[in-house]
Amino acid sequence: MIIYFAVITCSLKLCRSYYKMLLNVSHTIQCVFSRMSWYTLAVILSTLVTIHASQGPEKFTLATAIVLKRGEDITWSVSRENLKYNYRTVVDTTSKAFAVWHTAGLNFRFVYNYSEAMIRISFKRRFHGEIGYDFDGLGSLLAHAYLPNQGDLSSEIHLDNDEIFSFSMKDSDYEGDNAPTSYFWTVLHEIGHSLGVQHSASPSSIMYGWYKSRSFGNGTIVLPKDDANAIHQLYFSNTKQYAAIPKFEKNKVVTTTPVPPADRSESTTNTTITTCFSFDSLSEIKHDATKDSISAYCAGVYDAISYVRGDLYVFVGDLHWRFDTSGMLHNGYPQPTGATWRLPSGSQVNSVFEWMQYIVIQTGKRYNLFVGTDFVRSVNFKVAPSITFASNNRVYAAFLGKLKDITGHLLRRKNLRWRYLPPIQLLQNELRAATDILVASNGMYIFKSGVHGVVVNGVVEHYKLNKGVWSNCR
């Protein structure tokens, strides 16, 4: 049976000891989305939206509701391929992790036939067929898991085979600064993702946004109420639609379904989105950045702004800031852009966007194509576009206030005529002064110096300051 997986993934970079607990994380990730009802379990939900369970104490978010036949077992298996640990030890420890989730009312069953299992667990190294989701060797990135298919359950959990996992379930084996990484706690968290549960804002939750080796106690692990409630909503209530699963990293949480920050009272179509951004203060950021770039960023004046691999990137001068969708600045940022991507010396970043398998960085007349951070090639234009962005696998550039489709030119096709887009009001009135366009999951944003506006039916109704929304320096 061929299983088609959602392209949405979640990954786990786990902190091996107590990381500097960014105390406001439980507040920054709470977001509100409208409820959408459906009257039969047979309906497969296809639209993913973000919600926060604000009607009670729950702090979890979920993926699309799963349809299981009554009494159906969720099967799982472990691959022997590349396995450097004792197979029986891995299976036994994994079975104990599934037993914890079983207490929420789900039935799990181990099967030897790996290809027939609903949840398949395997060990991988470095690049393993997933662009943008490579493992990184020993340390940092430990595992990632696929979101279940919409409407049914089929998922994979990959663990980094370069890591050194401990299968011990004794607290004394995880004490000290050089404590090993617990396979049990790692796979327990990833199973939650493979079942469709996103991160929780509750520190006591198994699905909390940072890894920590918890106490095994007397060997009986109790599923926290927050996680049990998530399973109940996902498998037994099926009354809501939920969000995609985030990556889970060592010092931050990264969601693969980006939702740009919006004003608390702002509505788009039939859905009200509230995204609560809380940024680290500049005094807590260690870097050698120039004062001009920092000042411009804090004033909300950007050279380019874009979502790349689910993270929000803001480019100012020779620096770039990288944020997850809970609004947390990634550890170690801002960073010099030239230290991440090999760009021409002294070049100015004008636009950044994802297109096909590439990350494309426009520097004047030149388009630099990267796979990850590896330079592939460049494409040069005679005239430098003012802004460039990608939408629906097409690339558009603004020349003198007019948008042109330049997809074919990036593909180096010859004798291709540039196609003008329809002259909607946005293109006529806004593009000449625009500094960038951001295409997000819930709409399009146009940026000018220090301000941004939401594009609705080709028209920007009003502009708001970037300061305090897309950047917030305290």
From Swiss-Prot:
Signal peptide bounds: 1-17
Q: Where is the active site?
A: 190
Molecular function (GO) terms listed?
metalloendopeptidase activity; zinc ion binding
Q: Which GO terms describe its cellular component?
A: extracellular space
Q: Which domain of life is it from?
A: Viruses
Instruction: Relay the cofactor remark from the entry.
Output: Binds 1 zinc ion per subunit.
Report keywords, A-Z.
Answer: Hydrolase, Metal-binding, Metalloprotease, Protease, Signal, Zinc, Zymogen
Q: Where are the Hemopexin repeats?
A: 299-344
One GO BP annotation here? extracellular matrix organization
EC number(s) reported in the record: 3.4.24.-
Q: So where does Zn(2+) get bound?
A: 189, 193, 199
Checking Pfam families in the record gives: Peptidase_M10
Which cofactor is recorded for it? Zn(2+)
PANTHER family linked? MATRIX METALLOPROTEINASE, MATRIX METALLOPROTEINASE 1, ISOFORM C-RELATED
Give the family, as the similarity comment puts it: Belongs to the peptidase M10A family.
Q: What is this protein called in UniProt?
A: Putative matrix metalloproteinase
Give the organism, scientific name: Heliothis virescens ascovirus 3e (HvAV-3e)
